[in-house]
Swiss-Prot record:
GO terms for molecular function: RNA binding; rRNA binding. It comes from the Eukaryota. It comes from Saccharomyces cerevisiae (strain ATCC 204508 / S288c) (Baker's yeast). Residues 47-69, 342-355 have a biased composition (Basic and acidic residues). It is found in: Nucleus, Nucleolus. The keyword Ion transport does not apply. One of its GO terms (biological process) is maturation of LSU-rRNA from tricistronic rRNA transcript (SSU-rRNA, 5.8S rRNA, LSU-rRNA). Belongs to the RRM RBM34 family. Keywords: Nucleus, Phosphoprotein, Ribosome biogenesis, RNA-binding, rRNA processing. This is Nucleolar protein 12. One of its GO terms (cellular component) is nucleolus.
Length: 459
């Protein structure tokens, strides 16, 4: 230090140098450290937040004092955004860090509980809640009724007209057929068994079908007036039993039984006897008015017959000219084939008094039944895409067993009390009147007629 001063100012007397100044220049601080400069904290005034709030309040008062502006102008002109003052300190930015962290944890736990699978009735049935009120009609009541129903064919039409014949018919199918054939020694046991059998073979209802009428009247009117077709004197019937167990016994014991000189065909509706083509023959070239009893007597010498079926028209109930005969034994078919191209005596072609043929006997065409391919299935208005396997099974079974009327309404939704009606769901069953053309001939004539009537009234 002294050498530098000596070079500038020359030799200086040490006595003249002040000691305090000499100590100040002799001690040096050295170079400045950059880290020490950056680590210095800034002082923030405590009233900065209050100033910001006061500025925002003043700005709101100014906006409220301004006159109202229309909606269109407010949409076009956007108000200038107020810039928020930046927080001066990092600690101020992270004041709510801990509170936000715990809130995030609580939200994650709540979402995890919501995502857990809950076992409910809707998951088990895989059906939405909205479809609980809707019910598809699968005709379960009609299917259960078909299990207790027996079909009886080739019945004499006097069952409808005569009360005596009707009582005999009801007694035949209302009692146990096995008890009549078996003989028992004790009369008391017979009476007790008959009472129990009568309960088992109790009839719920009897309905007659395939009735041919002489005049083209409504069926109810023609039935009340008993205007039946003279050449079609046989009908069919359906008997509904109260117990399901009676159907099998009735079908196995009363099939091919003679009632009023007619062989009855008895079969179950739900479980009909299978059509065995090996034991059956096809009979063609029949008269349209031919009856089943003529075929029974013609083919009875060939062997025991299981049933005779003449194919008839659904509207007129008259024959179509061919039939099927099924035997109980396979060997009977070979004997029946020998009757090919041989005439058959018909009861309809004989005079009642002289019993002589009124028409020439027809030569029958007898052949074996062929293996025909199945035709197209009977269509229904049922959408099967939204059904389960069990529902499809029930729908397919109902389609085979039920009649035309029940098949048409199969699979439709049942209206439940309390549901709102929607447009297009129900049918009014009324024909909508077509609007008349504005330029048609009818409108022109009506306008001219109205004008003529108006002129007459003025005169």
């Amino acid at each position: 230090m002294s050498s530098a001063i000596d070079n500038l100012f020359g030799n200086i007397d040490e006595k003249k140098i002040e000691s305090s100044v000499d100590k100040l220049f002799s001690s040096s601080c050295g170079p400045i450290n950059k880290l020490e400069v950056k680590s210095k904290t800034r002082t923030v005034l405590p009233d900065s937040k209050k100033r910001e709030r006061a500025a925002e309040a003043d700005q709101e008062e100014k906006e409220a004092s301004k006159p109202d502006v229309s909606d269109e102008q407010t949409e076009e002109v956007a108000l200038p955004k107020v810039k928020k003052a930046k927080k001066s300190k990092r600690n101020d930015e992270d004041e709510d860090l801990e509170a936000r962290y715990y809130a995030k944890l609580l939200n994650e736990e709540a979402e995890a509980e919501d995502d857990k699978p809950t076992v409910t009735k809707t998951d088990e049935t895989s059906v939405p809640l909205t479809s609980a009120a809707k019910k598809v009609d699968f005709k379960e009541d009609e299917l259960e009724k078909a299990e207790r129903t027996v079909f009886i064919g080739n019945i004499l039409s006097t069952v409808i007209t005569s009360k005596k014949v009707y009582k005999e018919f009801k007694k035949l199918f209302g009692t146990n057929p096995i008890a009549e054939t078996e003989e028992s020694g004790n009369e008391k046991e017979e009476e007790s068994s008959k009472k129990s059998d009568n309960n088992e073979f109790a009839i719920e209802s009897i309905r007659f079908r395939s009735i041919s009428f002489d005049e083209a009247l409504p069926r109810k009117v023609a039935f009340v007036q008993q205007k039946f077709h003279k050449s079609r004197d046989t009908i069919n019937a359906y008997i509904v039993y109260k117990n399901k167990s009676a159907v099998r016994k009735i079908c196995s014991n009363l099939n091919a039984v003679v009632f009023q000189d007619h062989h009855l065909r008895v079969d179950s509706v739900a479980h009909p006897a299978p059509h065995d083509k090996k034991r059956s023959i096809f009979v063609g070239n029949l008269d349209f008015e031919e009856i089943e009893e003529s075929l029974w007597k013609h083919f009875e010498p060939c062997g025991d017959i299981e049933y005779v079926r003449i194919i008839r028209d659904s509207k007129t109930n008259m024959g179509k000219g061919f039939a099927y005969v099924q035997f109980k034994d396979l060997q009977s078919v070979n004997k029946a084939l020998l009757l090919n191209e041989k005439p058959m005596k018909s009861q309809k072609q004989e005079d009642e008094n002289t019993k002589k043929p009124t028409k020439k006997a027809r030569k029958l065409r007898v052949s074996r039944c062929k293996n025909m391919k199945k035709g197209t299935t009977i269509g229904t208005g049922l959408d099967r895409n939204g059904l389960t396997d069990s529902q499809r099974t029930r729908a397919g079974r109902a389609k085979k067993i039920l009649g035309k009327a029940d098949r048409a309404t199969l699979g439709q939704e049942i209206t439940i009390e309390g549901l709102r009606a929607k447009k297009g769901e129900g049918s009014t069953h009324l024909k909508k009147k077509k609007q008349r053309s504005a330029t048609g001939r009818v409108t022109k004539r009506s306008i001219a007629f109205k004008k003529a009537q108006a002129e007459k009234s003025k005169k």
